[in-house]
Amino acid sequence: MKVTFEELKGAFYRVLRSRNIAEDTADACAEMFARTTESGVYSHGVNRFPRFIQQLDNGDIIPDAKPQRVTSLGAIEQWDAQRAIGNLTAKKMMDRAIELASDHGIGLVALRNANHWMRGGSYGWQAAEKGYIGICWTNSIAVMPPWGAKECRIGTNPLIVAIPSTPITMVDMSMSMFSYGMLEVNRLAGRELPVDGGFDDNGQLTKEPGVIEKNHRILPMGYWKGSGLSIVLDMIATLLSNGSSVAEVTQENSDEYGVSQIFIAIEVDKLIDGATRDAKLQRIMDFITTAERADDNVAIRLPGHEFTKLLDDSRCNGITIDDSVWAKIQAL
């Protein structure tokens, strides 16, 4: 089915207000969920909303909590999220990293006691739109086996890197081949994964998203490399925020909350003039996209460049929502 942006935001707002969320908070949160969905990221927009409400109802998310600054060391700050709403808090933290970068050239905010930030790419994009390089990542509950194991002991720990090119170039990736949200998107669409995404119950690689969702044997990106990167990202976020590690979140909390996150902004224009920056970025992009194609029917893509097209399509033709997901939201 198709809905307009206003219909989608209104549905989110209604549910949030029914939970006695303050009007301005409900409006801002609904806006972020709707913008994420409008950009084509269903997995962390509309599809994730019922799960968000479940955590809100369970008390994992404290909607009226206010993040508090704990430590300030010039370009580096440490904050406690107080388990406030994840996407609103993350937006505020990247804004703060940008403010620090405007003063120091680079700004880093380490956040503890946070909730799921939904679409991590929103915060990298937020920085890049203002001309900054944006880098951020989060840890999570243990939902992925480390390389060589059957049991989940590491997080998917998504990493975002956004560059202020024209258009914005951005990598937004979990440390697994596919996020659990993308497994759901493919399962709901009745599709196999395009490449192996995990192991089946017999230990064989599989492209079946439903199987991986059930047994949680999701495949690390790049096999042992993604496993290793997940581990060190967790360590850095834990140490800089003085927050909870994947192990602590998993063993001490009843669900995925109280996670640790990092937000970095770099004001590149302090290091290079605008004309030179643009020329260098364009040369990089042209060098890549003019390579001989392996398949004439498949374009060479740069990461993040598809989002402008997806956004335009949603605004022209409406936002596609899975019927079963829409029914869940209407029932909340």
UniProtKB/Swiss-Prot annotation:
Pfam families given in the database record: Ldh_2
GO CC entries: cytoplasm
Catalytic residues as annotated in Swiss-Prot or TrEMBL: H44 (proton donor)
Reaction catalysis annotation: 3-dehydro-L-gulonate + NAD(+) = 2,3-dioxo-L-gulonate + NADH + H(+); 3-dehydro-L-gulonate + NADP(+) = 2,3-dioxo-L-gulonate + NADPH + H(+)
Subcellular location(s) per record: Cytoplasm
Superkingdom as given in the UniProt entry: Bacteria
GO molecular function annotation: 3-dehydro-L-gulonate 2-dehydrogenase activity; NAD+ binding
Positions bound to NAD(+): I168, T169, M170, V171, D172, M173, S174, W224, K225, G304, H305, E306
Keyword set, alphabetical order: Cytoplasm, NAD, Oxidoreductase
EC nos: 1.1.1.130
Oligomer and partners: Homodimer.
Family statement drawn from the similarity comment of this UniProt entry: Belongs to the LDH2/MDH2 oxidoreductase family. DlgD subfamily.
Function: Catalyzes the reduction of 2,3-diketo-L-gulonate in the presence of NADH, to form 3-keto-L-gulonate.
Matching PANTHER family: 2,3-DIKETO-L-GULONATE REDUCTASE, OXIDOREDUCTASE-RELATED
Protein name per UniProt: 2,3-diketo-L-gulonate reductase
